[in-house]
Amino acid sequence: MPRWEAAALLAAIVGVCVWSDDPGKVISDRYAVYWNRSNPRFHRGDYTVEVSINDYLDIYCPHYEEPLPAERMERYVLYMVNYEGHASCDHRQKGFKRWECNRPDSPSGPLKFSEKFQLFTPFSLGFEFRPGHEYYYISASPLNVVDRPCLKLKVYVRPTNDSLYESPEPIFTSNNSCCSLAVPRAVLVAAPVFWTLLGS
């Protein structure tokens, strides 16, 4: 392969790598939680999901395809609570109602609620999350229903490298250097290969 073709190929590869390494792109994952007492992850009481900022948590409510007596269908009111409310499974401990799973026999399928973990929300009823913090959800059965276990979920928002909220000490989050050079990783990896191809 002639030298100029190798250089052009390498430049194209580096360009694609740099373009795909754009830090401005928002990449998110979705995590599904099936909120019902038959979900084994709820049985020990330590169900935890780890998310990152911009990820989604999808809560799927109980749903029944076959007809069942109403008293056998699971219905829940989900609350976001503080640590004490999670530990005691008491939504009155600084908790607020988040969602209501109240249509287990809906012909259109299970109710699904989604939580987006974001630093800032444009919605007045939205919730803002901070990296490095834990958030807690519990459910309470409707008042006329007894013998329902307490279902609890802990969500941990992973710290990020560019977050200003993950360290209580500002010295660890501020950039004290007078200048910084932001070089994409792909360029640093490809530079030695490029020089090797040119030298051969």
Swiss-Prot record:
InterPro entries: Cupredoxin, Ephrin, Ephrin-A_Ecto, Ephrin_CS, Ephrin_RBD
One GO cellular component term: plasma membrane
Tissue occurrence: Expressed in a gradient across the tectum being more strongly expressed at the posterior pole.
Function recorded in the entry: Cell surface GPI-bound ligand for Eph receptors, a family of receptor tyrosine kinases which are crucial for migration, repulsion and adhesion during neuronal, vascular and epithelial development. Binds promiscuously Eph receptors residing on adjacent cells, leading to contact-dependent bidirectional signaling into neighboring cells. The signaling pathway downstream of the receptor is referred to as forward signaling while the signaling pathway downstream of the ephrin ligand is referred to as reverse signaling.
Subunit annotation: Binds to the receptor tyrosine kinases EPHA3, EPHA4 and EPHA5. Interacts with EPHA8; activates EPHA8.
Location of the protein in the cell: Cell membrane
Main location: membrane
Lipidation (GPI-anchor amidated asparagine): 175
Bilayer topology: Lipid-anchor; GPI-anchor
Signal peptide: 1-22
Propeptide: 176-200
Limits of the Ephrin RBD domain: 28-161
Disulfide linkage: 61-101, 89-150
Protein name: Ephrin-A2
Source taxon at top rank: Eukaryota
Record bears the keyword Lipoprotein: yes
Species assigned in the record: Gallus gallus
MF terms (GO), sorted A to Z: ephrin receptor binding
Gene designation per UniProt: EFNA2
GO biological process, one term: axon guidance
Keyword annotations from UniProtKB, A to Z: Cell membrane, Disulfide bond, Glycoprotein, GPI-anchor, Lipoprotein, Membrane, Signal
